Regions:
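Intrinsically disordered terminal extensions that flank WD40 beta-propeller domains
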Residues: 1-138, 428-434, 444, 452-457
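Beta-strand-rich domains and repeat architectures in extracellular enzymes and scaffolds
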Residues: 130-158
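WD40/WD-repeat beta-propeller blade N-cap
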Residues: 132-139, 176-187, 223-229, 265-271, ...
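WD40/WD-repeat beta-propeller blade-loop signature
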Residues: 138, 147, 183-186, 195, ...
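Loop/turn segments within WD40 beta-propeller blades
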Residues: 143-148, 190-196, 202, 232-239, ...
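Structural hallmark of WD40 beta-propellers
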Residues: 149-152, 196-200, 209, 218-220, ...
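Conserved strand-to-loop turn within each blade of WD40 beta-propeller repeats
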Residues: 154-157, 202-205, 244-247, 285-289, ...
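WD40-repeat beta-propellers
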Residues: 160-164, 208-212, 232, 250-254, ...
């Protein structure tokens, strides 16, 4: 009897399902992309190997001293690059710091450039007199763009002419005939904003006309004064406009909002001149009331300075703390905001005629410097130097030109002075200089580049 242990059982068959296939372990085909990468990596590996071999061969040929020298040179080059970057950053920081310091000192009226000694007296070839057929009568006003690219002049015949400084010619004009809706009589005052976005003008009407200085298109008309406007000025680096009028008031306008802001009262006679710088302040000359008023707009207060006998016709700021005034008695006065009386007075600055002093018809100041200019009808533009802490004024030289010096302005760098010249006074026709010509005088100054900067505390 055989044991079941020794019996072979039937082998169990494994039946596979239909559709089941035995997977073959075939290697995947490499894609073209992988092949390319493989080729690239192999090529780069080859390059690295070659480079390292070349380097090894170089280092094999190098002595220890040569290797030290090479590594030292490489280290020095890296240091030079790092230091150059640091120096560049430091230079930028220094420039920014100097600019901020300068702006702060300028705002406080503590900055002064001693530049008068660097001026050289202009020769005849440094003078240029230009005329325009549109200006048939006396020129009354002039203004210069802050980038010194163009100049505007106004005249008694009701025309405004735009001049190109680089082009040295007339670029356009606004005449009474073509713009009779906006220009009503002779142009009294013009001003341009610091960014050259707006040009404003006033004439024998109580309105202010706003223009685009680039296209000379009319933008807006401001109404509010009761008599014609004698002076216009923009607050520096803003679109705040200050206007002075024969109605004895000062008005403030916002050109950003195209709106009237407020009116300032105080003068007892028609205002003859106005000026402003960076601070929220305006300074005005009151004519026959013989006063200069500094309007502190933010504080809603004013400072009053009483001038010499006569009509106080002109006022210009030297900086935020000092200003110059001119009267019809021929006197020039230098003032400080901290004192009620002039620091210095020059009597009969332009001489006299028949024992009558020639009145001051215009002033121009080179901002934050010790230089200013004055004009009358003695055929001279006189330049003056302020010294000894503003307590003394010395004559520098004169520029000869025939006529009334009705308005003048320096360029920002002080290298040019533009003078509006006419046969008559800008405010009337008391008498006429027949030998004079109506035009724009350009005086070119030669200034040595280096000059001293003083800070006053």
């Amino acid at each position: 009897m055989s044991s079941s242990f020794f019996l072979k059982g039937k082998s169990r068959q494994v039946y596979k399902r239909k559709g089941d296939k035995i997977k073959k372990n075939n290697p995947k085909k490499q894609s073209a992309h992988n092949l390319e990468n493989g080729n690239e990596s192999s090529e780069s590996d080859l390059d690295i190997r070659k480079f390292s071999e070349a380097e090894e061969s170089e280092s094999d040929h190098e002595t220890a001293e040569q290797k030290k020298l090479r590594l030292a040179k490489k280290y020095l080059e890296e240091i030079e690059k790092e230091e150059a970057k640091r120096a560049e950053l430091k230079e930028i920081d220094d420039v920014v710091g100097d600019r901020l310091k300068k702006d702060y000192l300028e705002l406080k009226g503590k900055l002064k450039y001693e530049i008068a000694e660097k001026f050289e007296e202009p020769r005849q070839e440094d003078l240029r007199f230009i005329r325009a057929k549109e200006h048939r009568l006396t020129l009354t006003c002039v203004c210069i763009s802050s980038d010194n690219s163009f100049v505007f002049t106004g005249s008694k015949c009701g025309t405004i002419v735009k001049w190109g400084v680089k082009e040295k010619r007339k670029l356009g004009s606004l005449t009474y005939k073509t713009h009779s809706h906006f220009l009503k009589g002779g142009i009294v005052s013009i001003a341009i904003s610091t960014d050259s976005k707006y040009l404003v003008s006033s004439d024998e009407s109580p309105n202010i006309q706003l223009w685009d200085p680039h296209t000379l298109k009319h933008i807006h008309t401001f109404k509010g004064h009761k008599d014609f406007i004698t002076g216009l000025v923009f607050r520096k680096n803003t679109h705040d406009l200050y206007s002075a009028s024969k109605d004895r008031s000062v008005k403030i306008w916002s050109l950003d909002e195209m709106a009237y802001v407020e009116t300032l009262f105080g003068h007892q006679s028609p205002i003859t001149s106005i000026d402003a710088l960076t601070r929220e302040r305006a300074i005005t000359a009151g004519g026959r009331d013989t006063s200069v008023r500094v309007w502190k707009i933010a504080e809603e207060s004013q400072l009053i300075f009483n001038g010499p006998i006569g009509s106080l016709d002109e006022v210009k700021l030297l900086d935020e703390e000092h200003f110059v005034s001119g009267s019809d008695n021929g006197s020039l006065c230098v003032w400080s905001l901290l004192k009620k009386k002039p620091l210095c007075t020059i009597t009969e600055a332009h001489g006299s005629e028949n024992e009558v002093p020639r009145w001051i018809t215009s002033l121009a100041t080179l901002l934050n410097s010790d230089v200013f200019a004055s004009g009358s009808y003695d055929n001279n533009v006189k330049l003056w130097r302020v010294c000894e802490q503003y307590r003394k004024v010395l004559p520098m030289f004169s520029v000869n030109v025939c006529g009334f010096m009705n308005c003048m302005q320096f360029t920002n760098d002080g290298r040019q002075l533009y003078v509006a010249v006419g046969q008559e006074h800008k405010a009337g026709r008391w008498f006429k200089l027949g030998s004079a010509k109506n035009g724009l005088l350009i005086v070119n100054f030669n200034i040595k580049t280096a000059f001293k900067i003083n800070v006053f505390f």
